[in-house]
Amino acid sequence: MDNKKYKRACVMVRNIKISVVKVRRILDHVRKYSLRNALMLLEFLPYKGSLVIYKAIKSSYFNYKNFWDFNVTLDNLYITKAKADSGPMLKRSCPHSRGKAFPIRKRTCHITSMI
């Protein structure tokens, strides 16, 4: 088996104030597309997280361009890895009847994209 060194560029965006489930729903649409198609798709998706993912993928493209090959185009690159992991949770409480307090969990996530 070949032990080639593959050229990759990775970006991690941390502590985004969006739930992991909502981000994963968008990432499932985008995986395994060429960069041009993925960015075009993200531009027109009506979700809140699509703008953050758009910026992350575009940043990984510029990282690849600066580090490996300056003349590369969007059509030649593909998204090899795109994942969302849960981040720290902000815990708040909401007052309820009889002096009780119910917890509110404000979830955050980390996005990793690799081309």
Swiss-Prot record:
Q: Where in the cell is it found?
A: Plastid
Report the GO terms under cellular component: large ribosomal subunit; plastid
Transmembrane among the record's keywords?
no
Q: Which GO terms describe its molecular function?
A: rRNA binding; structural constituent of ribosome
Per the database entry, which stretches of residues form a coiled coil? none
> Which PROSITE patterns does the annotation name?
RIBOSOMAL_L22
- Keyword set includes Flavoprotein: no
Q: What does this protein do?
A: This protein binds specifically to 23S rRNA.
So what family is this one in?
Belongs to the universal ribosomal protein uL22 family.
Name assigned to this protein: Large ribosomal subunit protein uL22c
Which source organism? Euglena longa (Euglenophycean alga)
Q: Which gene encodes it?
A: rpl22
